[in-house]
Amino acid sequence: MRKTLLISFIVPAFNAQSTLTGCVRSIVRTMSSCRSNYEIIIVDDGSADDTPRLAQSLAEEIEEVTVVTQENRGLGAARNHGIDEANGLYVAFVDADDEIKASGIVDFSLLNGSFDILCIPILRVTSKGKTSVYGSTTQRIPFGKRFDEARDYLRHRNVIPCACAYLWRRETLLTRFHEDIYHEDEEFTVMSLLHGGTLICTNQLFTYKYICRPDSITTSSENAGKRLADIATIIGRLETYASAHPEQKRYMRTKLLWLHIDYLRQRLRYHR
């Protein structure tokens, strides 16, 4: 029987030799008061650089780290693989080029199974080291706010789409990431919130540090065409779901509107 842990941190890694070690060590530092009750699952997504060796070295050094490998199938597939391997009561996603840091007050008792989803702060860090709170202009939800149904958090709100902004109770996480597309978080997060139970917004666990890099998949102009096409695909899939499930449509309207706005912004940005 597999031991049930508190949190499974899923770290997809593709050609991440320059950032993987910093990412993993940030998790270890953050969880220092909860040692041996968590795991870090590095999913090597067919890396062609030194990532596999670094991952194995970290696993040999840190007992909470395990490594699984797959052929290069993309971020969504790597996250799905990690979910299948996870043993934690909760699942947290941390991209290999990002980090986390402990909050001033850490209260792991929040992770007692009472909440299906916990929304945590995201700090955007630029390449010059400037920081800002990600999503602060669209969220406006006080920490400690609870929702009996996660879809009430989604309603009338342009929720942060990043799956890394939430901890997900593994047993209730029914949605999987759509593979082979960019912006897979947009669909995953909406569908997970629609079907999730209790949700709380908290700053008493840890903060996710989203480190902006000019060469990342979601910012590089080289991928603009595919990103636009994939946003359109996601909008189409969500609208199809909304049409088939009218009882859910009212919870999706605001997010769908913002997705359309984002699509138009991207077109104007890259197709002037």
Each predicted region: which residue ranges?
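Cell-envelope/extracellular polymer assembly enzymes that use nucleotide-activated donors
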Residues: 6-8, 39, 187
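Acidic helix N-cap motif at the loop->helix transition within catalytic regions
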Residues: 18-22, 49-58, 99, 103
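Glycine-rich, basic loop-to-helix element that forms the pyrophosphate-binding segment
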Residues: 70-86
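C-terminal subregions of glycosyltransferases and related glycan-biosynthesis enzymes
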Residues: 204-272
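Short, well-formed alpha-helical segments that are part of the catalytic scaffolds
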Residues: 16-31
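Short aromatic/hydrophobic "clamp" motif used to bind/position activated sugar donors
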Residues: 91
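Donor-binding/catalytic cores of nucleotide-activated saccharide
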Residues: 75, 96-203, 208-228
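A conserved acidic beta->alpha catalytic loop
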Residues: 26, 44-54, 95
